[in-house]
Amino acid sequence: MSTDVETGHYSQSSQVENGAACIPDAISFSESKSSGARFAIMLSAIIIGVTAGTLFNTQMSPALTGMFLALTLVGGFLSTWSPCGYSSLSLLRPAGKYSLGSVARWTPTFITHAIGYAIGAVMLGGALGLVGAFLFEQLAFSHMVIGLAALSIAYGAHQLGFLRMPYPQRRAQVPHDARFRFRSSTIGLLYGYALGMNYLTYVQTPILYIVTGAALLSADVTTAITIIAIFNIGRCLPVAVNFLPVSNQSVQAWLAKWQERAVELDGFLLLSIGAAALTMLTL
């Protein structure tokens, strides 16, 4: 497998394990836009963010909360375009030909997968909340917003290729061989937990770093768990596509088609919301 996580490119060759072929994560991806087009995206994101910040300046608190919650949920969804996102959609599927019966038999797998995400949210969010309560309880709200907004803008520029930012992650996938050793529902739980912890596998979107920072700086265990849980809901929901009569090939092809656009959306959201937050604080 070869990967360039920071630019959103992935490829994985087919392998054979215990006589069963592993489905590649993707075959081909859409092409990146030119630097001029990416600069236009960056500029438009900043302009839209500044405009939104100006318009909602008198309602700063609810506006910031709404924008952050939207960013968190969408960030979880954008994590689908990672090696583990591809793998979960292709490996956690109903067995055999699609039918109401196969979907019913697969439903416990989806449920345990969601439970795994919930456990991950409690563990990661709880840890961040505890550390935050010890270190950042006295941090001013405005300072927190300024720090997260600046980080958001920096990573937005990173996603569009105009700035190099640190990208901490564990370069690992969920274990593919687990499907040869455990029943489907157990695999769903293991995958959900590994992905729900968010830092045990590849990090696709730097929105995760903003979400992590917000959970940490909230200095409250309940708030931190809620923040991570919202992100994990976005990560978990795409697997529900397997309730529909769609082939694995069509899902993988759709993901590959929109791979680069997902990275651009990532950068656009980070830039626009970061710019909006800074604008509201300065007016």
What residue spans do the PLM features occupy?
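Alpha-helical multi-pass membrane helix bundles of inner-membrane/thylakoid proteins
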Residues: T3-V5, Y10-S34, L55-F68, G101-V103, ...
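Hydrophobic core of alpha-helical transmembrane segments in multi-pass integral membrane proteins
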Residues: A37-F56, L271-L278
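Residue-level signature of transmembrane alpha-helical entry/exit and packing/kink sites
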Residues: R38, M42, L64-T72, R105, ...
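Helix-coil boundary and interhelical linker segments in multi-pass alpha-helical membrane proteins
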Residues: Q59-L69, L130-V145, G213-T226, L281-L283
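Membrane-interface helix-loop-helix junctions at boundaries between adjacent transmembrane segments
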Residues: T65, V74, P94-I119, M123, ...
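Functional transmembrane helices that embed catalytic/metal-coordinating motifs
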Residues: F68-L100, I111-A121, S184-S218, T222-P245
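Hydrophobic cores of alpha-helical transmembrane segments in multi-pass inner/ER membrane proteins
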Residues: V74-S90, G147-R164, G234, P238-N242, ...
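Final/C-terminal transmembrane alpha-helix of multipass membrane proteins
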Residues: E260-L283
